[in-house]
From Swiss-Prot:
Omega-hydroxyceramide transacylase involved in the synthesis of omega-O-acylceramides (esterified omega-hydroxyacyl-sphingosine; EOS), which are extremely hydrophobic lipids involved in skin barrier formation. Catalyzes the last step of the synthesis of omega-O-acylceramides by transferring linoleic acid from triglycerides to an omega-hydroxyceramide. Omega-O-acylceramides, are required for the biogenesis of lipid lamellae in the stratum corneum and the formation of the cornified lipid envelope which are essential for the epidermis barrier function. It is found in: Cytoplasm. It comes from Homo sapiens (Human). The keyword Lipid biosynthesis applies. It holds the Pfam family Patatin. This is Omega-hydroxyceramide transacylase.
């Protein structure tokens, strides 16, 4: 027989050792199911199985080919039985031990002792001298069940009188060897507790050194302390089922490590796992089939496209995108890039762009307005205490200056209704009171040059009325001028922005000229002058 390079070689004998686990045998059941699913030859070619306590029961079931589902169903019933009483498994009315014996009598075949003889090694602790005894010879099914019962018996926990095997009293083998037959060089060790075993939970230890207890290596971690408690006093079934899946995953990780060792070997003499004949490579390596990976890739690409789509989109003609704005036929940027908030700050008539003539026959509609987004102005201190400034909802486009400037002598025109004007001019975003008379013309002439000649005649009158009625409002007006002195205009790429820049530029020059000659008290009218 050739020398074995790595334990688990199917061409040379190897062994599997199960540690004591108590109620945490869910973990070992998950590991056995993983080996059956991914590496069935590993269980078939193993010539020795060793176990103690509940691990001995798992080993016997694995040798006899009994499904772990039946064992887990009985274990679920036993956990529910233990949860009924306050003392749990220490209660005298607990029937957990009797339930397990009845389960073994029911599921084990009659010739199970023949199959397990020489192959199953059960670890026991002799009561008289406390020595560890490993038995592997059975003459009947009852003798096999008695050996398993002695290996699981914990004094006081399971009863007061220990059972006997061949006339000698034995107790749980975990007291003298938690990991049975760990000295076997070809043994693949499976443990519920984190340590140096091949298949076991991997925790982050609190200290770097392991400690030995019951002739077994343990990591000193909070998780291990919790596992020791759960082994004797079972937690909820949800936690126990998590132990099952954890055992399955740890067995898969072990197979991956073995595959890496085999693939990186230069001589290829490390037989396990000989992936083409020994293990299902797709499942052991965690590779997904192409048919399964394609839908996930498409879904991932769709999610990436959906994440980047709202930043910039093409709006078709006539589609308002949920708002009442004008139809746009060119690609526009969304509200996220145009401005942070619509124009909602009070702006004096000096900083307002020149008003466009209103239609005399039809009310003002949004369909005739150009698709231009006006600057976002931060809200300065209000010039009039107690004035409320409503802001348009985010779904509506910002109001243009043509909608803001209206004559105060006539009813203010709005989108849906008309309201009489108050004697004090309102500084809201919809109307700005100013005693100016505007010539009426059709809205079709909107792109034409605005009437700049009338700007110098009407604005001094508006400023004079505002100052004469409330002189203290002049200081905030200067502050507003400084705030909006450099407007930031965001407009559609399809529109020409020259006329907007001209209007703002002329308005700014005229405003500064008017400020220089502006009197603090009302006086005679100054002669009108045209903008240079």
């Amino acid at each position: 027989m050739e020398e074995q390079v790595f334990k688990g070689d199917p061409d040379t004998p190897h062994s599997i050792s199960f540690s004591g686990s108590g109620f945490l045998s869910f973990y070992q059941a998950g590991a056995v199911d993983a080996l059956r699913d991914l590496a069935p030859r590993m269980l078939e070619t193993a010539h020795r199985f060793a176990g103690t306590s509940a691990g001995a029961v798992i080993a016997a079931l694995a040798i006899c080919g009994i499904e772990m589902d039946e064992y887990l169903r009985v274990l679920n019933v036993g956990v529910a039985e233990v949860k009924k009483s306050f003392l749990g498994p220490l209660s005298p009315s607990c029937k957990m031990v009797q339930m397990m014996r009845q389960f073994l009598y029911r599921v084990l075949p009659e010739d199970s002792y023949k199959v397990t003889t020489g192959k199953l090694h059960v670890s026991l602790t002799r009561l008289t001298d406390g020595e560890n005894v490993v038995v592997s010879e059975f003459t009947s099914k009852e003798e096999l069940i008695e050996a398993l019962y002695c290996s699981c018996f914990v004094p006081v926990y399971c009863g007061l009188i220990p059972p006997t095997y061949r006339g000698v009293r034995y107790i749980d083998g975990g007291f003298t060897g938690m990991q049975p037959c760990a000295f076997w060089t070809d043994a693949i060790t499976i443990s519920t507790f984190s340590g140096q075993q091949d298949i076991c939970p991997r925790d982050c230890p609190a200290i770097f050194h392991d400690f030995r207890m019951f002739n077994c290596s343990f990591q000193f971690s909070l998780e291990n302390i919790a596992r020791m408690t759960h082994a004797l006093f079972p937690p909820d079934l949800v936690i126990l089922h998590d132990y099952y899946y954890r055992g399955y995953e740890d067995a898969v990780l072990y197979l991956r490590r073995l595959n890496a060792v085999y693939l990186n070997s230069s001589s290829k003499r490390v037989i396990f796992p000989r992936v083409e004949v020994y293990c299902q490579i797709e499942l052991a390596l965690g590779n997904e089939c192409p048919e399964r990976s394609q839908p996930s890739l498409r879904a991932r690409q769709a999610s990436l496209e959906g994440a980047t789509q709202p930043h910039k989109e093409w709006v078709p003609k006539g589609d308002g995108r949920g708002s009442h704005g004008p139809p746009v036929s060119q690609p526009v940027q969304t509200l996220e890039f145009t401005c942070e908030s619509p124009v909602s700050a009070p702006v004096s008539p000096l900083e307002q762009p020149p008003a466009q003539p209103l239609a005399s026959s039809t009310p003002l509609s949004l369909s005739g307005m150009p698709p231009v987004s006006f600057p976002a102005v931060h809200k300065p201190p209000s010039s009039t205490p107690g004035s409320s400034l409503p802001t348009p909802p985010p779904g509506l486009s910002p109001l243009s200056p043509q909608q803001q400037v209206q004559p105060s002598g006539s009813p203010a025109r709005s989108l849906h209704s008309q309201a009489p004007t108050s004697p004090r001019p309102s500084l809201g975003p919809s109307t700005v009171g100013a005693p100016q008379t505007l010539p009426r013309s059709s809205l079709s002439a909107f792109p034409a040059q605005p009437p700049v000649e009338e700007l110098g005649q009407e604005q001094p009158q508006a400023v004079a009325l505002l100052v004469s009625s409330k002189p203290k409002s002049a200081v905030p007006l200067v502050h507003v001028k400084e705030t909006v002195s450099k407007p930031y205009v965001t407009e559609s790429p399809a529109e020409d922005s020259n006329w907007v820049n001209k209007v703002f530029k002329k308005n700014k020059q005229k405003t500064s000229g008017t400020r220089k000659g502006f009197p603090r008290h009302s006086g005679s009218k100054k002669p009108s002058s045209k903008v240079q």
